C-alpha cells in the first residue's frame, strides 16, 4: 500500500501496547482485548510527519473488518518526535479512534509515542501489529478476525459494551452482520447493521429467536466461541446502576425472518406493543419501591441478505428477508433481572405470542432497490426519536389510555425491504399488523366477541347499535312516548299513536276507505280528495287576518258580502223562496240546488242559456225572448252576444286580439288597455310577491300561487270522470270534460283534426297553435305562448319526462 492513514480528532488518553503487557495475551485462537471507552475513526488530512519502520510480520495474522483502503495518517504534531525517526513499540492513540476504519492488512511493528503527545495525525507507509494488543480507556476494537481459523474474542468493557464477532471464513463469506455501533443515545441512535453470520439451518425456520442486547453505558462481556450463540457477561468492577436507582438506556434488537407461506390478509406479524406493561407484564412505576423499570419504545427495521446487484428478487427471496425489532429503554438491576425472568418465561411458554413472519412479497411487490453498503448487503439506518428526556421518566405519571375509536386506526412504522418506512395497521385485540385498513376490517371478523359489543346504547331501553345515526333515529321514537299528553292523535278517528310512522300507516287505511270523499274549503269553492291538500290550501290562502269579523261567533271573512251572507245564519233571514213550493233559503245557491233536485221532474223544459227549467214549452219560448232582446250585439268572430256595445268591445279585445301592448314591469304580464294595467299594478303595491319554488311564476295573491302549484306541479288528480276515468286537478276542469260526453256542440279546428265542446278551449287552441305572433314556442310540440312563464308551465305539465330546457 502506498499511503495509509487515520485522522485523530481528540487528545490521546489511551494506547496500544505491543510489548506483551499484563491483561493482553494470545491463547491459541483466542485473543483477549480490554476496552473501556468508545473512540471513533474519521477522515484523512494533509501530511507533515511520516512514521516509518512499520513492516508487517505476517499479513494474515490480524484482520480488522470493515476497513477503509488508501487511508494516510498524516500531520502528527509531536514536539518530541523527529521526522524519519525510529520509535519504540508503544503507540498512543487518541480517544476517537475506531479500529474498524484501520487500513486492511496493516499492522503495527515498532511504534512508540510519548505520553505528552496530544491529538495528532500519525502516518505510516507500512504498519504491523503483534498478536498481543492492550487497549486503553477509550478504544473499542469492534471486530477482529483471524483468517482461516475459528477463534473467540472476549471483550472486557468497563464503560460501554460493543458486540464483536469472529469471522470464521475469509471476507468472501456470506455475512449478515459484521459491526453494530450505537452512538450518542441521548436524543437519538443510529444503527448501521451490515449483517450477522446466519447458519444454513436457521434459514429454514419461519423466524429467528436470536437477539442482541446493546448497552450504551453498562459494563458487560460478550463471549463467542464460534460454535454456539453469543453470551453476555454483565459482571463488572463498576456498579452500572446510578445513585438514584436508575440504569443506563438499553437497546434490545430482535431479529426475525419472513415466512413465504404467510401471505393471506396482506401479511401479518405479532409484535409486542411498545408500552412496558405489554412487553414485560410489569407496571410502569412500582409503588412499593423506587426501582424504575425500563422505558422502552418499539422501532422496526430490516436487514437484507447479500444479493448480487444484477439479480432481481422474486417473491420467495423477499420473503426470506430479515426484519429487526428494536426496544429502547432505561433499566436498573432489579428491573433488568425481572425483565430477564419474564423474557425467559415467555420463551418457554408456547401460549405467549411470538414473532410471526411478514410476507411482504404479496403486499408490496418485488421492489428490491435498496441501499448497498461496502459489503454488498442492504444497509438500513435506524432512527430512534425519543419523546422525553432520560432523567424525567420518574417524574412523569403514567398516562391514561384514550378509549379507542372504531373509526380511528393505530399505525406502526416498519422499515421495509427496500429501506423505506411502511405503515401497518395493528389489531387492538391480538396485535397482528396489516398493510391496509381493509385487511384489518376483514381480520376483525375473527373476533366475534368484539363485534358483539355495541358502541351506542339507548338510555331508555335495551337497544344497542354500532351506528350513531341509528341510535338517533331510535331516540326519536321515545320523544313522543315519554309523556302521555304528547301522543299523536288521528284527526279523523281520534286514535292515538306513539310515533309519526304508525300514524302515517293508520291514515293510509282512512285514505283507502274515503278515496271518493271530497274535502271542501269553508272559505271558498276549493275541493280536494285529500285532507292534506286542503290543509295546505288553508295555510296558503286563508291564513291571513280577515278584516270582516262576525260579532256573534268571531268568524272572519275576506269580503263584506261573505259576512252579510254569514249573518243570515244568526238572524234567520231567508230571502230566497222557491217559486214552485214554500221552500226558502238564505243562499241563492242552495235555492238553485233545491229546484234542480226537487222540481226537475215537474219542469222538464230547460233554458239553454241560463239553465232555468219550465213546466211547458211556452214558458221556455217566452223566457228565450228575454235573452234575445237583452243581447242584441253579435260578435263578428264567434257566436258571442252582448247586451251592450261596451261588453262586446271588451269581448273582442280580450278574446280576439293578439297584441298585449301594455305589460307589467314586475311580472311581465300583458294587458289590452291601460286601465287594466293600472289595476294590475295597484295589486302589486304593498303586497309581497310570492315565487313558485318549481318555476319562475310570481304572483302577489297566495291563492293564485296555490292554485298554480296544484294545477301545474301536483301529480294528484282527485277529480275523475265516471265514464272514461280521466283525472283532473280541479272540479271545473271535470265539468268542462263532462260536456264532451253530453252530446253538445263540438268545435272542429279547420287547420287540424282538433275538436272540442269547450269554446274557450277551442279558441286557445287556434291562437296558440295556428298563430305565428307568439314568440315563445315549445320545442317539443311547437305550441306558441305569449310569455316564457306560460311555455315553462306547459312543459312542466305535458313534457315532464324532459323537464325545463
UniProtKB/Swiss-Prot annotation:
Modification Phosphoserine, positions: 274
Q: Which GO terms describe its molecular function?
A: chromatin insulator sequence binding; DNA-binding transcription activator activity, RNA polymerase II-specific; RNA polymerase II cis-regulatory region sequence-specific DNA binding; zinc ion binding
This protein's major location comes to nucleus
GO CC entries: chromatin; chromosome; nucleolus; nucleoplasm
**SMART domains assigned:** ZnF_C2H2
The UniProt keyword set, sorted, is: Activator, Disease variant, DNA-binding, Intellectual disability, Metal-binding, Nucleus, Phosphoprotein, Repeat, Transcription, Transcription regulation, Zinc, Zinc-finger
Q: Which disease is it linked to?
A: Intellectual developmental disorder, X-linked, syndromic 37: A syndromic neurodevelopmental disorder characterized by developmental delay, intellectual disability, behavioral abnormalities, hypotonia, congenital anomalies, and facial dysmorphism.
| Family from the record | Belongs to the krueppel C2H2-type zinc-finger protein family. ZFX/ZFY subfamily.
User: What function is annotated for this protein?
Assistant: Probable transcriptional activator.
The molecule here is called Zinc finger X-chromosomal protein
Q: Which organism is it from?
A: Homo sapiens
